[in-house]
Structures are given as C-alpha cells and as structure tokens.
Amino acid sequence: MKKWLIALAGVLLTFTLAGCGSKTVASTSGGKITESQYYSSMKGTSSGKQVLQQMILNKVLEKDYGSKVSTKQVTKQYNTYKSQYGSSFSTVLSQNGLTTKTFKEQLRSNLLLKEAVKDKVKITDKALKKQWKSYEPKVTVQHILVAKSATADKVLDALKKDSSQANFTKLAKKYSTDTTTKNDGGKLSAFDNTNTSYSSKFLTAAFKLKNGEYTTSAVKTSNGYEIIRMIKNPGKGKMSDHTADLKKQIWDNDMSDSTVLQNVVSKVLKGGNVSIKDNDLKDILSSYLSTSSSSSSN
C-alpha cells in the first residue's frame, strides 16, 4: 500500500509550489536556490511524489464530494479532538508538525475520503449480518475504579444492601480513583461496540447488564478493579432497526482497510480525468490508473 494513502488517512502533509520558475526561495553565500531548482529536486524524491499524489487526490475528492462535507462537520471533529486532549492539544499538534489550519485540512480530507468510500463500496446483506453479530447500541454506565480487590469487595458489600443509582453515586465519590468521573458518580460518556477507550473485558461486562444492574464481581482491567452499573441500555433489538448504524460501522472499518482504500482511490482517480504534464512524473499514479477491481464489504 502506498504511504500516501496512509498519510491521507493519518497525518496530512501540506505542500505548495507557486508557479515554478526563477523566483528565489533561498539564498546562501554559495548562491541562490530558485523555485525551478527546488521543484526539480523535490519531484525526484519519494516524499515529493507522495505530496503530489495527495494534492491530485484531494483535488478530485474535493470536486466529487466537496458539497457533502461541510465546515460544520470539520469543526465538530476538530472540537472533539480538542476536548479529548484538553490543555495538551496545542502541544500534540506541534509534535505532529500540524497547525490548527493544517489539522482541519487533514480532517476535511478524511471526511472527503470517507464520502468516496460510502459512494464506491457496496455493502452487502452478508456484511450487515456479520457486523450485526458484534453490534451493541450505545449504552450509558457509571463505574467505580479501585486499586485493590479488598476495596472492591467493600463496595460490592455496600451495593448488596442498596444497589440504587443514588448509593452507587455516593460510593463512587467516596472510593473511586477515577478523578475524572468520581464527582459525577462515575458516569461515563455513552459508548457502543466500536469503543477503543475501554478494555474488551470492561465492554463485555457492561453490555451484559440491563438497566439498574451492576457487576456482582469486580472486573479486573489494566486500570485496577472496576464495578460497573448500567444506567441506560436500550437493548439490541432487531437488525432492521439499526441498518444505518451498521453501515456507519462498516464504513469506519473500511477507512482502516488498505485494500479497500486502494480500490476506492483507484476508482476516484480513474474518474478524475487526471493528466500528468511533467514527463518525469507521468507514471506517478500508474499503479492506480492501470488496474480495476470491484469494491464491496461482504
């Protein structure tokens, strides 16, 4: 898989050349470097070619799917990441060589690519049924995290006497070591089966609970011992009621599948009327323009 595809779905590289010519981009005691010299040097490198590939794909994606991706969507994703990293957000951007502007460009490119995936990949009934097996709707729980099993046993003994939400909240404030949630009674943001923040043990235990139920034994995770109480579990219901969610999960999985992405990008570029004017770069997209294959999630 070409690195540029991975970069597009991960860290977007930005690169601009303003009419390559005699304009000086740098000067030294040994002479000056012109735009044309810089261009000639860059186009022979793998990174230079990757950037051009990205620029071409972005142009075609923007034309085909630009109207489907709004500034509001980009801003929403940006704010989600900003909230996730909190005060360290600016540092994280800087460490990855990104600014607010370039990060938003990255997010927009990912959203455009996802629209292409949704357009080019056919989701079969078989794929929906397969995704349904692991599907769980969004649930809301509260938890109590402690470091020692003895403490967990003490909490469980208290819950045997009173398993109400009010008492669980009281116990979370008293015993939980999760400083982020304890003051809110250990309440966590809603999550479904695609969540990667919690361990598989935690998720498995949580999804088994009905409203008002709690884990009668502590769940051992890498964080410690956790007691989970279900606040809201709508139940899995029928597959036909969750088709939209299932498709979304499949498309999200496709965004991490290099084979699917390569097929999608190939189709996008073939329909983009791409013409490479520089003979030295004429084969830059050959691996994508010379083959054809069907894309489907099955």
UniProtKB/Swiss-Prot annotation:
It catalyses: [protein]-peptidylproline (omega=180) = [protein]-peptidylproline (omega=0). Its EC number is 5.2.1.8. It is a lipid-anchor. It comes from the Bacteria. Its main location: membrane. Residues 136-232 form the PpiC domain. A lipid is attached at C20 (N-palmitoyl cysteine). One of its GO terms (molecular function) is peptidyl-prolyl cis-trans isomerase activity. GO terms for cellular component: plasma membrane. Keywords: Cell membrane, Isomerase, Lipoprotein, Membrane, Palmitate, Rotamase, Signal. Residues 1-19 form the signal peptide. Pfam families: Rotamase. A lipid is attached at C20 (S-diacylglycerol cysteine). GO terms for biological process: protein folding. It is found in: Cell membrane. Disulfide bonds: none annotated. Belongs to the PrsA family. NCBIfam families: PRK04405.1. Plays a major role in protein secretion by helping the post-translocational extracellular folding of several secreted proteins. This is Foldase protein PrsA 1.
